[in-house]
Amino acid sequence: MSRTGTKPKTDWDVIIIGAGPAGMCAANELADRGIGVLVIDRGRDIKERHCPMEEAGKCAQCKQCDIMCGVGGAGTFSDGTLNLRPDIGGDLAAITGDNPTAWALVDYVDGLFLKYGAPERLYTADGAQVEKLKRSAASVGVHFIEIPQRHMGSDNAPRIIENFENDLKSRGTVFRLNAQVRDLLIEDNTCTGVLLEHGEKLSSRFTLLCPGRIGGEWVNTLVKRHGMDAKHGAIDIGVRVEVPSIIMDHITKINHDPKFHIRTKRYDDFVRTFCTNEHGFVVKERYEGFIGTNGHSLKSRRSDNTNFAFLVRTELTEPLEDTTRYGKSVSKLATTIGGGNPILQRMGDLRRGQRSTWSRIRRNPVKNTLEDVTPGDISMAMPHRIVMDIIEGLEKLNEVIPGVASDSTLLYAPEVKFYAMELQVSQELATSTKGLYAAGDGTGLSRDIINAAATGVIAGRAILQQLEKGS
C-alpha cells in the first residue's frame, strides 16, 4: 500500500486535516499497516496547549487560541464528558444506515478512550430516579433524555489525549503541527493533496477533512470555491447559565450532564441544555473577530457553582440560509456591546429589562467564576426572539429544577455552537470530490466528542479499504 523507496516528505498515502477526535480516530484505523499517514493541525501539541487566562483571569488575545486549536481538538478543555449515545451530538444511525451499527461504533470509541486512560466509572442513573425525573419534566412539557456518560474532566482529558497521540506516533503516524492548510489541491474533481499557508504543497492519495469547529468557516469557503455538494444546517445560539451547585446537585447525581429539551410556547422554538459542568467554571473562547463562552469542570479544582449552555436552535431559509454568517453577526454584536468581553447579566435584570452593573454583580448571591466580563444587557446584543426563548425556556426548566431561573442566576453571552455546512457524503463519508472524505464537527457531520470520533472511525476504515483495493 505504501510507495516503494524513500518516501519524500511531501508525498503521503493519507493526509488528515485536523488532530481532534475525528482525525485521531481515523489515524488509529490506518496505523500499523505500512501506510504513510500525516495529521496536520493549525494548533499546538497537547503538552504545549495552555490558556493563560487560567492565571491572569483575562483573555490574552493569543494569535492561536489553545482552547480551540491543537492536538485533541476543542473538546480537550471542555468538561470532558463522553455521551455514549449515537443520537446525542449527531445522528450516527443516519450515516451507518441502522441503529445496531451506530451503537457498536459508540462502544468501540468508548473502548478507545478507556484504553488511553479514561476513568472506568460510567455514570448511569438509578432507574427509579430517572423515571421520577422524566415524569416531573414531562408534566410541564420538558423532555429529559437519559444518557450513559463517562466523565474525563478538563484537567484529565489532556493526559488521555497525550497517551493516544504517543501511541499513534509509535505506530508510524506523523503529526505536523502549527501548520495551517490554506486550500485543497483539486483537479478534475479529484483531491490530490493540500496547499499549506506559506505555499507548500503536499500530495496524497486520500485526504480526510476534519478541521473541527474552528475550521467550520474555512470548510464553507472550500465548498463555495470547489463546488462541493453541501447544505446549510441549523445553528445553536444562547447563553451560558451559572447557578449555585446545590440547586442542580440532585439532578447531576442522576445524570452527570443532564439533557433537557424544551419547546417554547410563544414561538414553538427548540431550546436545550448542553455541556453541564458540575462545580465548574465558565471560560471565554476567542474566535476570529469575536468572543464566546464555554464551561469547564476540573477533577482537581471545584467551584461552588454549576454551569450549562442554554441554546436556541435556529434554522434559516432564503434569502439568508447561511446560519454561520448569521451566528457570527450575532456574536460580533455581542462582542461589540461587551467591549471585547462576554456580557454578564443577572436573570432578574434581564426579566425586568435593565442592564446589570458591577455593583449588582458584586452583591449578587451567585459569584461569577469568569471575571473577564462586562456587566450589561443581553437583549441589546441578541435578537428579541432568542432572548424571549431563553427567558421562557429557563422559566419552564425552573418548574423541573426550582431555582434555576431565580433573579440571582447568572447569564453569559454569547454562547454559540457553530456547525459547518453539512457536506453531502456517502455511507463511507466520501464527499462529492473523489479522494476526499469528511468527518467531525467542522464538516457538519457531528456535534460532540463521541460522534466526531465515530465519524473518524468510519472514514478511516473506508480509506483503508480503498487503499487495500489499490485505488
What is each PLM-predicted segment?
Residues 106-116:
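Conserved catalytic/binding loops enriched for acidic/polar residues
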Residues 89-105:
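Short, surface-exposed, low-complexity cationic segments
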Residues 121:
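Flexible glycine/acidic-rich beta-alpha junction loops that bind and position SAM and/or redox cofactors
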Residues 103-107, 362-363:
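Charged, glycine/proline-rich intrinsically disordered loops and linkers
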Residues 80, 116-117:
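Low-complexity, intrinsically disordered basic tails/loops
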Residues 2-90, 94, 127-471:
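Residues forming the flavin
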